[in-house]
Design a protein with these regions (language model features):
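Feature captures the catalytic ectodomains and active-site-proximal regions of enzymes
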Residues: 1-513
């Protein structure tokens, strides 16, 4: 008889780094995790690069991690897919891109591109912008403008100026394009309905409102001098002869080159929704609006360049087909990850799948100001679910190591790690009490490296470090094999539950007897 419930606990952004310097995982007091790693089956798992369908050496991220876990197989990511299409030349024949181009040609209007300008590879990749510039050049367009969203989370906090300078050099080399506006992702890429931020971004893009600068790099440097790094650069427009270089207006084409949906939805809604109540928008602009991927199927008036490749028989579907009950628990910041992404990009819950959302704190601008976030509330719900006897499977995410790690504030990251450790302790007690089994892992690293070891600058991005795989309260004869990746976790749980792995899942169980 298999144990019940089976809990998958995801410690978001909790990587393992042999260098203890500026490493919150190492520096925090973590008696629970230390004990589990020494007394339970424990190995390091891969959560980056080819092991999760990303280019070699590319750090993992939450979307990719949860997608690979839930699918029980390596899912080739949009980044890899789009880069490959540029290399193969298919990119230049994508019908939606050609529709945008034709609209500009026919009406003599401008082609605008916007998105994150960095090589972070989480939401976008700068080489994809170069592909779009090449596309514009091949099609003879001359009114081509890029609106740059600066990163500083998946890249160093003041690397944006360099990325924009590189972009401008590429524009010269290819022979087309100008930078029209610049803003931090804090404004343009909110995902928490903080519409006041999105409004500032939208008004810069469509009305030329905001700060002014004579050049993009000059404006970014001014922002740095003012103590605002990439993520927080207040929207500014680049002026030409005393006027904004370009604003998005009726008749133009827009290509939004972010491929990750969660932080692309709000600004897209501001442009595309016929009825929009996020802020007071004058009117819906008449545009050809192309998204790299489908950010949300409920957003209307948009074209999608790279359609979703469907993933069949995810863990959620598999459990539903076998009449098993399941619950997903997370706070707001990671709720989409344990639901939408874990289910292979499907919003609709499976039969027998409950969802518990604990609101993330709204009263702080950045989570270093509240590193415990809503972890205790999430943990309360977890313990309740474990003891309820209602569920065969519980999937839980603790957001703190990732969300606080992104701030680069070391004391706060340590507090985040310690908060989560205490929560893990409560879960372990509950699991032992009901004689269930728990698999603890992370989706990628982050909190275990908070400075760039070469430059000494704050390091706020994810890492390529391995993550913990820990098996708690399983049959004592089980060990875990080395060399596993995120795609192997669900096959492991399926074996623990005494069930047969579906053929669609190509991951391999980590259990060794």
């Amino acid at each position: 008889m298999s144990k019940k419930p089976t809990v998958l606990m995801i410690l978001d952004g909790y990587g393992l780094n042999s260098n203890c310097d500026h490493n919150a995982v190492c520096e925090g007091r973590t008696p629970v995790m230390d004990q589990l790693m020494s007394q339970c089956p424990f190995v390091k798992g891969e959560a980056s690069g080819m092991a999760v369908g990303l280019p070699e050496g590319q750090m993992g991220n939450s979307e990719v991690g949860h997608l690979n876990m839930g699918a029980g197989r390596i899912v080739y990511q949009e980044l890899t897919r789009i880069t490959k299409s540029i290399q193969d030349g298919d990119f230049f024949q994508v019908p939606e891109f050609l529709t945008a181009v034709e609209n500009c040609k026919k009406n003599g209007t401008a082609l605008h591109m916007f998105g994150l300008v960095s090589d972070g590879g989480v939401h976008s990749h700068n080489t994809h912008i170069y592909g779009l510039l090449e596309l514009a050049k091949r099609n003879g367009l001359d009114k081509v403008y890029v609106h740059c969203f600066l990163d500083g989370r998946d890249t160093p906090p003041e690397s944006g100026k360099g990325f924009v300078a590189e972009l401008e050099a590429k524009m010269k080399e290819i022979g087309v394009g100008e930078v029209a506006s610049v803003m931090g992702r804090y404004y343009a890429m909110d995902r928490d309905k903080r519409w006041d931020r999105v409004e500032l971004a939208y008004n810069a893009l469509t009305k030329g409102q905001g700060n002014q600068a004579q050049s993009a790099t000059e404006g970014i440097q001014d922002s740095y001098d003012d103590g605002k790094a990439d993520e927080f650069v207040v929207p500014f427009v680049v002026e030409k002869e005393g006027k904004p270089t370009a604003v998005i207006q009726d008749g133009d084409s827009v290509i939004f080159y972010n491929f990750r949906p969660d932080r692309a939805r709000e600004i897209t809604r501001a442009f595309c929704d016929t009825v929009f109540d996020g802020f007071a928008r004058d009117k819906k602009l008449d545009l050809v609006f192309v998204c790299f991927t489908d950010y949300d199927e409920t957003i209307e008036n948009k074209l999608v360049a790279f359609k979703k490749e469907s993933i069949t028989n995810t863990f959620g579907e598999f459990l539903a087909a076998h009449d098993k009950t399941q619950v997903r628990i997370a706070e707001t910041e990671k709720y989409a990850h344990v639901t939408f992404f874990f289910n292979g990009g499907v919003e609709e819950p499976n039969k027998g799948e409950d969802r518990i959302l604990v609101p993330s704190p709204k009263e702080v601008a950045t989570y270093d100001l509240k590193p415990e976030m809503s972890a205790v509330g999430v943990c309360d719900k977890l313990v309740e679910a474990i003891k309820s006897g209602k569920y065969d499977v519980i999937i839980i995410n603790f957001a703190n190591p990732d969300m606080v790690g992104h701030t680069g504030v070391e004391d706060a990251a340590i507090k985040a790690i310690e908060t989560v450790d205490a929560c893990v302790g409560r879960a372990v007690e509950a699991i032992k009490e009901v004689d269930g089994v728990m698999f603890i892992c992370a989706d990628h690293g982050n909190a275990e490296q908070l400075v760039d070891y070469e430059t000494g600058e704050p390091f706020t991005a994810h890492t390529t470090n391995p993550v913990p795989f820990i098996l708690v309260n399983a049959d004592p004869s089980y060990k875990l094999r080395e060399g596993g990746a995120l795609c192997d976790i669900i096959p492991t749980l399926i074996e623990l539950m005494g069930m047969e792995q579906p053929k669609e899942m190509t991951g391999k169980s980590l259990l060794v007897k």
